[in-house]
Amino acid sequence: MRRYMVTYAWQLLKKELGLYQFATDIIVMIRVCKMFRQGLRGFREYQIIESAHWKHPIFSFWDKKIQSRVTFDTMDFIAEEGHFPPKAIQIMQKKPSWRTEDEIQTVCNILQVLDSYRNYAEPLQLLLAKVMRFERFGRRRVIIKKGQKGNSFYFIYLGTVAITNDEDGSSAFLDPHPKLLQKGSCFGETDIQHASLRRSTIVCMEETEFLVVDREDFFANKLDQEVQKDAQYRFEFFRKMDLFASWSDEKLWQLVNMSKIERFSYGQLISKDFGESSFIMFISKGSCEVLRLLDLGASPSYHRWVWQHLELIDDRPLKTHLREYSPMERFKEFQIKSYPLQDFSSLKLLHLKKAWGLQGTSFSRKIGTSGDTLPKMLGPKIQSRPVQSIKCAMINTKFGELPKEAAVGAYMKVHTVEQGEILGLHQAFLPEGECDTRPLILMSLGNELIRIRKEIFYELIDNDDEMIKKLLKLNIAFPSDEDMCQKFLQENSWNIFRKDLLRLLVEPRQSPPFPPIRPKKKEIYNPKSVVLDLCSINKTTKPRYPIFMAPQKYLPPLRIVQAIKAPRYKIQELLPQYKSAGVLI
């Protein structure tokens, strides 16, 4: 009995202790949450006062507990996103001979974000990472002064600099469109190799971070030998070209010293408009494509194509596209035909036009009818065709109305530039009235090119009639926008027909084991597949709000499509019908 009482008492005590421990945990959690709320209150107050003190980042207040004034500098808490990593700065503070191979490789990996650094060969990248030092300068600081001897060359890791012709760089802050160099660019390489005088002034437009290579380290670590290998490669490339067959080696080396190699990966943008570029590009390896962003809404062919296909919006069979009369319409038609000497079809159409006006015709267009204009009085045999209306927002173009959703653009390949070809000289010697001023995009397919400034190249070919005759033969006539639009529509029709045929002939796959509970509503434009579906233009769907939308300045001026699904006849009606094998109906 006593043993039973002891066991029972122990169980009660255990339960009470468990409840006590549970209550203790709750109290601790409440206290911790209270401490978090008190701490976050200061952050909320800082968010309120931060914008007010942005112009005066240092402020102070009187602390009653310590009986003294506390000073707070908001600039110490600004996020340093995009700045050069502190770990790499510590490495660059060492002498080049003290840096280990792992540290050099670490710096080399960090610098891969710089396009100008990535264009060098791998051995030269490692040598540059070994001798670089880090510098940070503020706004209006002159980095290079015109007329001075070049002792360093620079890579821009963060910030922007301007190129000017004055000595103090003040004109960069007065010029509305100064020449700018931004992150990833480099300057001063040519002057450091040949110990020449600076031909321009470089000034910081904002706080800028540089990676600097000094002349002493450049030659002490034999970087000049690696640079000479690249120069010899460029010389051999130019010497093999028929364009420079008549040039002497001395003159060709002048071209080599002013040129620079750049490498681009597959799909990388080389130039948004190479016609307006200040460089001439020689394709030394690989190939690239010339693209044109077409505004399809500005093409008369696209305008006709859209409205021809929208006539099939009701999805009727091939020979019964005109919709059948309803009983009420047949009765009204009978009333009109009951008067042998008069035709009231014009009054009927006028009444319909007034009704459409009340409903708002600015957001609709009639298609597939002969009632756009009032018919002439030709007797009682006139039969008014039924009118079908497209209810959607319209925009006015120079070719007429067009559905707002159908105003899209498409990228078209204009030309493929292969190895050994030249870009930037195809319109160099044409009159201004004959030049093609359309913006043309240059996209890499994995290539290497050699750049040289146009003004330098023009100085080298001055008074060289033989060279000018060769350059005149390089003129390329690109197709017009209308021709490219027609080609796009032809390719689009074939691609859609091919998909319809495959969908009809190939057996569908088995349904997935877990079908979606609620299917997604079909939208007119699908940004993932880049397809415009005009079949759904007359259907109302609730807008789906995306989680993230890019700012408008980062988006193209038009919605880009790769294909357009237009209303079309069913492919079963277009294929031949057979009673049996080999016997047509």
From Swiss-Prot:
Q: Which PROSITE patterns match?
A: CNMP_BINDING_1 (PS00888), CNMP_BINDING_3 (PS50042)
**Domain of life (superkingdom):** Eukaryota
Keywords, sorted A to Z: cAMP, cAMP-binding, Cytoplasm, Nucleotide-binding
The keyword Cytoplasm appears for this protein: yes
Q: Which CDD domains does the record cross-reference, listed alphabetically?
A: CAP_ED (cd00038)
What is a GO molecular function of this protein? cAMP binding
UniProt-listed InterPro entries: cNMP-bd_CS, cNMP-bd_dom, cNMP-bd_dom_sf, RmlC-like_jellyroll
Quote the subcellular location field of this record: Cytoplasm, Cytosol
Report residues binding a nucleoside 3',5'-cyclic phosphate. 116-239
What are the GO cellular component annotations? Answer: cytosol
Q: Does the keyword Phosphoprotein apply?
A: no
Q: What does this protein do?
A: Essential for male fertility. Plays an important role in spermatogenesis and regulates sperm motility by controlling the development of the flagellar bending of sperm.
Which PANTHER family did the record assign?
A: CYCLIC NUCLEOTIDE-BINDING DOMAIN CONTAINING PROTEIN, CYCLIC NUCLEOTIDE-BINDING DOMAIN-CONTAINING PROTEIN 2
Q: What protein am I looking at?
A: Cyclic nucleotide-binding domain-containing protein 2
Organism per entry: Macaca fascicularis (Crab-eating macaque)
Q: Which gene encodes it?
A: CNBD2
